[in-house]
UniProtKB/Swiss-Prot annotation:
One of its GO terms (molecular function) is neuropeptide hormone activity. GO terms for biological process: neuropeptide signaling pathway. Keywords: Amidation, Hormone, Neuropeptide, Secreted. Belongs to the galanin family. It comes from the Eukaryota. PANTHER family: GALANIN, GALANIN PEPTIDES. GO terms for cellular component: extracellular space; secretory granule. This is Galanin. It is found in: Secreted.
């Protein structure tokens, strides 16, 4: 999910936070 990661950084803190939350819930650290 590097694409999502890059998108998150581009979107800003909210994007990063959302991505991290999804990773946490799915356990895809």
């Amino acid at each position: 999910g590097w694409t999502l990661n890059s998108a998150g950084y581009l979107l800003g803190p909210h994007g990063i936070d959302g991505h991290r939350t999804l990773s946490d819930k799915h356990g895809l650290a």
